[in-house]
Regions:
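N-terminal, charge-rich interaction modules
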Residues: 1-32
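Conserved Class I S-adenosyl-L-methionine
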Residues: 95-116
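Short, intrinsically disordered, mixed-charge
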Residues: 39, 69-77, 103-107
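Short acidic low-complexity segments
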Residues: 40-51
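Mid-chain, well-packed structural core segment of small domains
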Residues: 64-96
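Class I S-adenosyl-L-methionine
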Residues: 109-135
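Short, glycine-rich nucleotide/cofactor-binding loops
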Residues: 54-64
């Protein structure tokens, strides 16, 4: 299934053939939203290391703030950590916004490079390690 743009969600998220990915705290319907993944993609539901792409779903800023350093450590230097939060219009209680994610991510050396709709409920902000901090 594709999002509003018609682009398949795996492509929006940057999931490529052979990628190591993790979906953290994903809603039950996330697999259906993703549809078919590229060949050889290894999916985990737990935080590991050496990930190409991870998607962390969150509704609490305090919890996300605690998780962000672990998310940064989990991705390859050129990988991406997506943070997905409920859209204001979704009616899902949250204290997270695009701005609060930036406020908490920037001091950790994470910068945002893209925003995308995941579905009617969730937005996503793509975070990457600042270029000068990549080893």
């Amino acid at each position: 299934m594709s999002g509003y743009s018609g682009t398949p969600l795996p492509k929006k998220l940057g999931v490529k053939e052979g990628a190591r990915v993790a979906w953290l705290n994903a809603p039950d319907h996330f697999d259906a939203l993703l549809g078919e993944l590229p060949p050889g993609v290894a999916v985990s539901r737990r935080l590991g290391t050496g990930l190409d792409v991870l998607v962390q779903f969150a509704t609490s800023r305090a919890e996300l703030r605690r998780r962000l350093p672990k998310l940064r450590d989990a991705i390859f230097p050129d990988g991406a950590a997506w943070v997905s939060w409920p859209k204001r219009a979704s009616g899902v209680p949250t204290d997270i916004t695009e701005d609060t994610i930036r406020e908490d991510a920037l001091p950790l050396g994470l910068v945002d490079v893209k925003v995308a709709a995941v579905d009617e409920t969730w937005s996503g902000l793509k975070l990457v390690v600042r270029k000068e901090l990549r080893g």
